[in-house]
Amino acid sequence: MFNNTVTLYNYDKFKDDYYYTVFKNVEVQEQQRSIPDDTHHGDYNNIYERAYDRALLIIKYKFIDGIKLVDGVPKTFLDPKEWNNTEDKSNNFTFQTDCDFFIVEENKEIKSFEELKNYKDRVYKIDIYDDYEYDLTHWEVYGA
């Protein structure tokens, strides 16, 4: 457990640009399944399946003097609104459920979610994240 590497991409809506953060020693639990495609319109020789992928990303952090720090990551976590309003986004990261995504590998190539998804596997758009600040301090980030 906790032997995966992921790259998180944060989208800056004001500059239309992405900032990336590499996390090592995180846990990724992936689910893949196929869903029958019902768009064949009577052509039963052409029944395709679409893959449905989901991932749970678990990132441990330390809560020191009100700051959330991840081992090996020289950046500070900020809540999404605070991150969007800060000038220096390169020294911080966040989890935005409407536009951020992650890939299960170290990848410093910055492209949009759609571009990266077209030629890489294991790319997930963040749709939920939970912050477990008062228990075993960690984030659970869900993506599809």
Placement of each model-derived feature along the sequence:
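N-terminal intrinsically disordered, low-complexity, charge/repeat-rich segments that act as generic
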Residues: 1-23
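Short, conserved turn/kink motifs that form compact alpha/beta structural patches or helix kinks used as
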Residues: 21-144
